[in-house]
Amino acid sequence: MGKIALYWNTIKYMKPSQIYYRMAKKIGLRCTIGCIPDTNYGDVALIKTPVDFDKDPVFLERFDADELLNNKVTFLHSSKEFLWNEKWAFEDQSALWNFNLHYFEYLFSMLSAYEKTGNRDYFDKTIFCIESWIKENPEGEGVGWSPYTIDLRLTNWISYYCMTEKELPTEFKVKLIESIHRQFVYLSNHIEKDILGNHYFEDLKTLVLCSLFFQDSTMLQASLKAFKAECKEEILSDGMHFELSPMYHKIIFEGLLRVIVALRGNGIKETELENLIQPMLDVAWSFEEGLERIPLFNDCGNNIAKSIASFVKICKKEFEITPHFKSNLEDSGFYIYKWDNWKMIVDAGQVGPSYIPGHAHCDAMSFELFKDGKPVITNCGTYGYQCEERQFFRSTMSHNTVMVDGVEQSQCWGAFRVAKRCSVRVLSRNENAILMELIDQKKNILNREIKIEPSKIIITDTCKNKVLKTSLHIVSNEVNINSAMKPVIEVQQYAPEYGIISNITVYYWLQKNKIETTVYLGE
């Protein structure tokens, strides 16, 4: 019965369309947006791309051009020797690592090295890598033909083509364009309507870019209509992406900017989409302004999305838009406090969209604290998806929050599943305090108040006749912790970036009815 209940409490939140398309895919039916690309295509168009994303120094540093030249690839802090003209899959690496192999983001590191040094070997290597992929990845076989990997690869290949078209050998250009079109057609028949969320967004974004690239007006009309509708669905009124991850917010924002820049370059101005730029930039800026890394709420890591500087640069250059700080993100439930050289971000949001909470953590009422941009009190991060550590990093204990009677806030299971969920609401808030109420998966009701005073933060957790467990994860000696009872101090796993784990000190308290903790701030 337990397993039946688990599945029921997961499935009941899904849209009927998701269940239908999941079953349709199982029996091999197509999943389209009601339109597929023209099989006959002529000349391609050099679409305008926001090259500052592909030339973002922080992004380029993730890939070593010399390693790539010498047949070594590194993703998510894990390296492999790879000859390219062999099977594009490593069973000893994670699914996410293998996905990254197929994204082709590393092309731009080699292009940058070529631009800086004039060494043609880097440029020729990009051609060899693409040719090898085309040869070694037959249509529909392996993770390289997963719709999400197609999305990112085609986005990168189109940018690559538009940046290098004049230098590419004619024979290779023909081969590259042919492969892009084949993948475009395949993607259009395998849209992720069963998953939705950021996956569906990326599918639609890629269809729009490919439609512009192949000058397919019928496909452009259909894909752009669907893309606009999905933006309306996924972008909240405060500008935050509805999956409530600062990292995925930037990934989605990048996709939106790529579409708008490409449309503008084609003489198409979509005001409805362009009106999203300012609020989405404000959200990204408000999270990261003055910080050395992205805040760790829900699935998040510092080595995936592009840098905040690249977003600011592109928005200014392309649209004359500059960011504004917002302390209240009421629709998404994030509240940001700044004073002196301190910054605190509080999460009072829901689990995420009810039908796709796959990137959710048990981090309700948690917070992160920074001093001079450096993390002081932090959540534990994400590390990976299909790994044994997944459950820990999604758990309540890996966040600076509270649980009752040992009950997880929400019932996270598998890599991307949530069954019973908590709910959160803000009872009151002002410029130096917030009072929140959480109802966990077992219907326990608990309150948390966070008060900021000149030299301290007071955290008060209450739940009548229940045993509370409050956790704080400390990465700096910039604070001192005090409570009426002595804390238990342990070492836990910490992953501010995907693919690498270090240690963090966790303080936790167990007490009935009420726990009050004071964080004294250093000078």
Spell out what each predicted region is:
Residues 73-98, 111-117:
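Asp/Glu-centered strand-loop micro-motifs enriched in Gly/Pro and often flanked by an aromatic residue
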Residues 236, 240-378, 427-433, 505:
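Carbohydrate-active enzyme catalytic cores, enriched for enzymes
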